[in-house]
Each structure stands twice: as structure tokens, then as C-alpha cells.
Amino acid sequence: MNLKMKSTMMTMMFLLSALAGCAGGDGAVDLDDSDGGYDYASNVDNHRMLMGDVCDIKDLSGAYDWDGVKDIYENGEYAEKSDGSYRTLMGFADAAGKNHAYDDYYGADGSWNDFVSAAIDGTGPFDGESDTVRDQAVEKGIQNGVMTAYAIHELNAAIIKAEAGNWGPDDAQHAWDEGWAFYHGPDDADADFDGCGPFATAAKRGGNFGTGDATNIATLAAMNDGLAALVAEDMQGVIDARDEVLKNVVIVYSQASVRYASKMTVDLDEANGDYDKHQAEGHAFFRVIEAYVADHTDGCYNMAVHKVFYTGDIDASTCDAFMWTQHNGEGDYMCYNTVTHQVSTDVTTETECDGYSAQLFQERYGAEKINEIYDLKNDGDTDADYEAHVRMYLQPVWDAFGITADDIGTLQ
């Protein structure tokens, strides 16, 4: 073989090697440029393919193949980068400094990884729990918790980039695209993974509550509006779009929290053996929104009647603002709060009205009560109407986000 032929063959081998190295990377994943009605401004194929990991984990978790789940969760499977490494679900879930509220709320970096890894390993709150409970926590925790956190992080990252003047398709628009990639996933024929993300959950909950595709339609519109605002360098438009996405996330996972609370009551009544399973599902679903809604669930405890008046987002001093008065000096007396302009119907006398005080402020009361319902160690109360309780605790949240009864719908 002469030198020229050797040189040619070595060059071909080098090129083939280089192409092989890109086989799993952004440029080599053959996806179209849109998903579910959203047209990407940039290449986020690698990010979209991460949803394939979620799909396979759901299958493995359902079969209680914890080693298989752990391998994909930690090492990745579909989202191979151009350098041969993989984007992984654990890599995001365990990362510090992400642009979402979960880690600050739970007081730990990588708070979603703490939850998911404990469920995979059967440790922490999942120590001694059944495979069924662990499966629900893993599936719901990854599909909904990790992927929603990832999406929110990217939308906020887009805003941060835009605030720094980096509005373009390589910067803020790229981050915004990533948000949809993680929320929706690819719907291509050869990579049909869009049934494994939060978007798919929203469709199911819409079916459960008679609201159809309302939340997904609103979320898609907000995503398209946000991208258009980035192109136009309209900061308020981007922020409004992000807030609309978050509002619809709250609707979806409020519906989920209500639904599985209702199932728990039925399970106890029928003694059908599904209580633990549905409790684990509700536990994971509420965790998706807890960090964003808990501050709207404060309350004031009344020492005289031993009840909590549910107020929404307040500070302790608001609990001192109850007074025994009449409306415009006429009619029956009532216990009126001069800050929230609410009337406590739990009390009927001035002495009882005086039972409220700042010292008895109940921070995040509603969120704590929901967590008590979904506590995996709680074996249930056959006399409790869990759906009614969860609805009551979430009502101030819905008021704060401008969420109506029609938005939530009626559980079918």
C-alpha cells in the first residue's frame, strides 16, 4: 500500500470516527423543528431527547427494576452530547444554583434528586415502603417534578439572559426553547416521547376534571407569546408569559392533588388496598407546586374557638387585625380583619374574636396540612373528606393566582 493510499484511508477513518462521535449529539438527532405547536428558534434536539430517558424509566420503574432505573437516571440513555457524554436527569435534579424555587424552599441543593433517589433506593421517607409506593414516587417525581423544575429553570434563565442584553437564538431564545423541550418533549415518529412529560400529565388531568386541553392550550400560547416577546425584546411580555406558564402549572398540579385526595377517601371507604399507592401519587404531585404555593396558605389560630382562620399570604401582624364591629355601623356585629377585609365566621362573640393574635400566626398552614394528608406514614382517617380538605387549603392559592372554579373544573 503506497503512502498516498494510506493517507487517504487514514483521513477517511478519521472522518468516520468524528461522525460517529457526533451520533448522539445535538446535530445528529434527526428531529423536526417543532413540537406540539411550538416552533423552536434554536437547536434543542439534545434537550428534547432527554424525555426518552423519562419514558424508559417509567417502564422500568413499573417493573420495579430499580437497578435499571438508577442506571438511566444517573448515566443517561438518549441525550448524548457531541463530546460523547450524556445529559442526565440526575445531573439536573442534583445540581445547585438552578433558577427555580424548590431548593430554597426545601433548604437543600438538589432537592428533587433527594426525593427521587430516596424513592429509587427505598431510603429516607421511602424506607420500608412498598415497591408500588416507590414506583409512583419515582415516576411522578421524575416526569412531573424534575421535568417541571427543569422547564421553570430554563424560562427563568431566558429572562436572566435577556436582562443582560442577550436576547438572541443562541442565548435567551435558546433557553426559552429548552423550557418547552423539557415540558413537552419530542413528538416525532422516531422519537415519540411527548407522552412522558408534564404536558401529558396536564392532558390527563384535564380529562379528569372536564377542562379538556385548556391548560395545555394556555401554556402553549404563553410559550409562543414569550418567544415572540424575546424576539421583540419586550421584557414585560416575557415575564407575563412565564407567569402564565406557572399559573397553568399550578392548575394542573392542583387538579392532581385534589384527584388523589379524593381517591384516598374512596380507598379507605372501600378498603380496596390502593390507599398507599394513591397517597404516594398525591404526595409527588403536590410537591411539584408546593414551593410556589405554600406562602399563600397562611392562617391565624383562634385560642377561644380552637380553629384556624385561613387567610392566604400574610404576616403575623395580620392576625392582630381582627375587630368586633358592624358594617358601616349597622346590622349584626362580626369579627372583621382590617388587613385582609375578611370576616371570620368561626366566631360569634367579641370575646371569641379577641382570640386571634399575632403570637398564634400559622405560617404555611395549608401546605403543612396537605403534607399531613400525603405523609406516607399517615394510615388515613375513614371519617375524613380529603378532597374537601385539599380544596379548602388550596383555595387561597387559587385566589392569589387568579385561578377560577372553571379553571379547576369538576372532578369526573
Predicted regions and their residues:
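Secretory targeting signatures
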Residues: M1-A28
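Intrinsic-disorder/low-complexity linker and hinge segments
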Residues: A23-S34, H327-E330
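Mature extracytoplasmic or organellar-lumen-exposed domains after removal of signal/transit peptides
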Residues: A28-A304, Q362-Q412
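Extracellular/cell-surface secretome signature
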Residues: C300-R364
